[in-house]
C-alpha cells in the first residue's frame, strides 16, 4: 500500500517551519528554524536570500530519512503584508520590509495630517 503525505510550509516573521502530515491529517514530522533578524537597528526587515536558504534547508531536513511515501501537495503560508521587491529576474532588490516595520510612520502621519487639513 502506497502512503502519501502533505507538506506544510510556514514562512513566518520569527520562525520558519516545515511539516509533513499523513492523508488522515496526523503530524509525521516537523522541523523549524528561527527566521533571520533585521540587520538594521530599529527596522523590521529580513534578507530574502537567507529566508530562501533556510526554507530549502528545512524542506531537505523534512524529507531526509522520511520513509513515509510520496508528497502529494505542498501548502505554503507566510507573513502578512510587507514589501518583497524582486528584479526582472526574480532576484531580491533589497531586504524584505516586514509588516511590522514602522520606518515610514512619520511620513504617514505627516501625509495624514496634511490630507486632513484639506
Regions found by a protein language model. Give the residues of each.
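Glycine-rich phosphate-binding loop plus the immediately following alpha-helix
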Residues: 100-118
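N-terminal glycine/serine-rich phosphate-binding loop of ATP-dependent small-molecule kinases
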Residues: 1-95, 106, 110
Amino acid at each position: 500500500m502506497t502512503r502519501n503525505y502533505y507538506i506544510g510550509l510556514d514562512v513566518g516573521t520569527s520562525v520558519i517551519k516545515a511539516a509533513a502530515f499523513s492523508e488522515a491529517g496526523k503530524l509525521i514530522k516537523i522541523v523549524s528554524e528561527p527566521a533571520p533578524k533585521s540587520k538594521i537597528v530599529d527596522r523590521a526587515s529580513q534578507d530574502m536570500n537567507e529566508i530562501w536558504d533556510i526554507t530549502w534547508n528545512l524542506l531537505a531536513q523534512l524529507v531526509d530519512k522520511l520513509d513515509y511515501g510520496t508528497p502529494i501537495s505542498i501548502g505554503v503560508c507566510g507573513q502578512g503584508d510587507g514589501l518583497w521587491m524582486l528584479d526582472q529576474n526574480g532576484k531580491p532588490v533589497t531586504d524584505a520590509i516586514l509588516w511590522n516595520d514602522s520606518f515610514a510612520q512619520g511620513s504617514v502621519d505627516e501625509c495624514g495630517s496634511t490630507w486632513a487639513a484639506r
